[in-house]
């Protein structure tokens, strides 16, 4: 039983480290993309396309006038 707990704790610890490293890498990639003007244009286009589709399918809340 003790070795099982040790193994599970080790797996949890390694998984946590792995996730934190992935988040750091993703954040670094996002920062690099923001610095590139071409990538910024693509991000804006993607956001507008998502907005159009979400309104079309009723996923976005309508504004009250």
UniProtKB/Swiss-Prot annotation:
One of its GO terms (cellular component) is extracellular region. Residues 23-47 form a propeptide. Keywords: Amphibian defense peptide, Antibiotic, Antimicrobial, Secreted, Signal. Its main location: secreted. One of its GO terms (biological process) is defense response to Gram-positive bacterium. It is found in: Secreted. Expressed by the skin glands. The keyword RNA-binding does not apply. Belongs to the frog skin active peptide (FSAP) family. Brevinin subfamily. Antimicrobial peptide. This is Dybowskin-2CDYb. It comes from Rana dybowskii (Dybovsky's frog).
